[in-house]
């Protein structure tokens, strides 16, 4: 499933083509994805101007000139394809290959850009686990999907002090705490594994056991911020590749320290250990037992 860096890269890739554009018409090719489309979905969007594209955690938000917002999630296999005069590609690289089969094109947004050029933004989703919902004017922040989300792991909002407060008294493993969207919004399996490796923290360690160690909390917060920032930057680089060579993967998977590297040497030069894989809450966890304690 695409995580925060991939969703942010998708947002940045779509932004030049969607912000300021007018929705000429919408082709809706089925009544539902994971959830049913909102009533009169295509009709309510036609003629509206797109004011801004945003992101909250792993959700894309599209803000229209009448105050209506679209909340979109890519699910397991969703992607947007740009077809325009000056671009053709899949914005946002992800570790797993995505479909380009037009049979799975479920929504097509026909846009007129401010410069008079036209563009089509196509949503493709073979497994149909993504969705698009409406948030009425003034109701976005209180939408059930968004209102309980935690702090964003980007910029300086996530600090050691914030992590310490979130983890205090929690017996859940560190990995589970970091994946809890009510605490930190947008982190997923890949980047949690990578972030825990950098400061040498075991994913099985109880979150509350490190809450009082401020130096550890600062290192973990810094690792989370840097992993996310580097992954976004790598996704941005892959965006250029997608325009030139459709379907190429992003770059960050070449920098994985532990994720997907079971049985391979730890990349900590002072370690000498081997990357292991265990299952936590039904998900694969990759870590080095020698240097992550």
Curated annotation (Swiss-Prot):
A zinc finger (FPG-type) spans 257-293. Monomer. Involved in base excision repair of DNA damaged by oxidation or by mutagenic agents. Acts as a DNA glycosylase that recognizes and removes damaged bases. Has a preference for oxidized purines, such as 7,8-dihydro-8-oxoguanine (8-oxoG). Has AP (apurinic/apyrimidinic) lyase activity and introduces nicks in the DNA strand. Cleaves the DNA backbone by beta-delta elimination to generate a single-strand break at the site of the removed base with both 3'- and 5'-phosphates. The active site is at 2 (schiff-base intermediate with dna), 3 (proton donor), 58 (proton donor), 283 (proton donor). It comes from the Bacteria. GO terms for biological process: base-excision repair. Binds 1 zinc ion per subunit. PANTHER family: FORMAMIDOPYRIMIDINE-DNA GLYCOSYLASE. The keyword Glycoprotein does not apply. The keyword DNA damage applies. Keywords: DNA damage, DNA repair, DNA-binding, Glycosidase, Hydrolase, Lyase, Metal-binding, Multifunctional enzyme, Zinc, Zinc-finger. Pfam families: Fapy_DNA_glyco, H2TH, zf-FPG_IleRS. DNA binds at residues 104, 127, 170. It catalyses: Hydrolysis of DNA containing ring-opened 7-methylguanine residues, releasing 2,6-diamino-4-hydroxy-5-(N-methyl)formamidopyrimidine; 2'-deoxyribonucleotide-(2'-deoxyribose 5'-phosphate)-2'-deoxyribonucleotide-DNA = a 3'-end 2'-deoxyribonucleotide-(2,3-dehydro-2,3-deoxyribose 5'-phosphate)-DNA + a 5'-end 5'-phospho-2'-deoxyribonucleoside-DNA + H(+). InterPro entries: DNA_glyclase/AP_lyase_DNA-bd, DNA_glyclase_Znf_dom_DNA_BS, Formamido-pyr_DNA_Glyclase, FPG_cat, MutM-like_N-ter, Ribosomal_uS13-like_H2TH, Znf_DNA_glyclase/AP_lyase, Znf_FPG/IleRS. Belongs to the FPG family. It comes from Brucella abortus (strain 2308). GO terms for molecular function: 8-oxo-7,8-dihydroguanine DNA N-glycosylase activity; class I DNA-(apurinic or apyrimidinic site) endonuclease activity; damaged DNA binding; zinc ion binding. This is Formamidopyrimidine-DNA glycosylase.
């Amino acid at each position: 499933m695409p995580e925060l860096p991939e969703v942010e890269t998708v947002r940045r890739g779509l932004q030049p083509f969607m912000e300021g554009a007018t929705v000429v018409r919408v082709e809706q090719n089925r009544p539902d994805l994971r959830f049913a489309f909102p009533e009169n979905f295509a009709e309510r969007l036609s003629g509206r101007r797109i004011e801004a594209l945003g992101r909250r955690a792993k959700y894309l938000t599209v803000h229209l000139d009448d105050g209506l917002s679209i909340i979109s999630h890519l699910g397991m296999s969703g992607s947007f394809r740009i077809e325009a005069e000056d671009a053709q590609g899949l914005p946002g690289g992800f570790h797993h290959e995505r479909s380009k089969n037009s049979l799975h094109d479920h929504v097509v947004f026909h846009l007129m850009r401010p410069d008079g050029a036209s563009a089509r933004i196509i949503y493709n989703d073979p497994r149909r686990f993504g969705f698009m919902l409406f948030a009425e004017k003034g109701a976005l922040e209180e939408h059930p999907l968004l209102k309980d989300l935690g702090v964003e792991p980007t910029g300086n909002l996530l600090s050691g002090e914030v992590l310490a407060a979130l983890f205090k008294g929690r017996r859940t493993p560190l990995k589970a705490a970091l994946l809890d969207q009510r605490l930190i919004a947008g982190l997923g399996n890949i980047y949690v594994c990578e972030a825990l490796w950098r400061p040498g923290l075991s994913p099985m360690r109880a979150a509350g056991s490190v809450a009082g160690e401020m130096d550890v909390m600062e290192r973990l917060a810094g690792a989370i911020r840097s992993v996310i920032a580097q992954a976004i930057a790598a996704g941005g680089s892959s965006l250029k590749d997608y325009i030139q060579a459709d379907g190429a993967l992003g770059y960050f998977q070449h920098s994985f320290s532990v994720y997907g590297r079971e049985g391979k040497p730890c990349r900590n030069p002072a370690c000498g250990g081997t990357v292991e894989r265990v299952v936590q809450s039904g998900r694969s966890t990759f870590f080095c037992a020698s240097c992550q304690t």
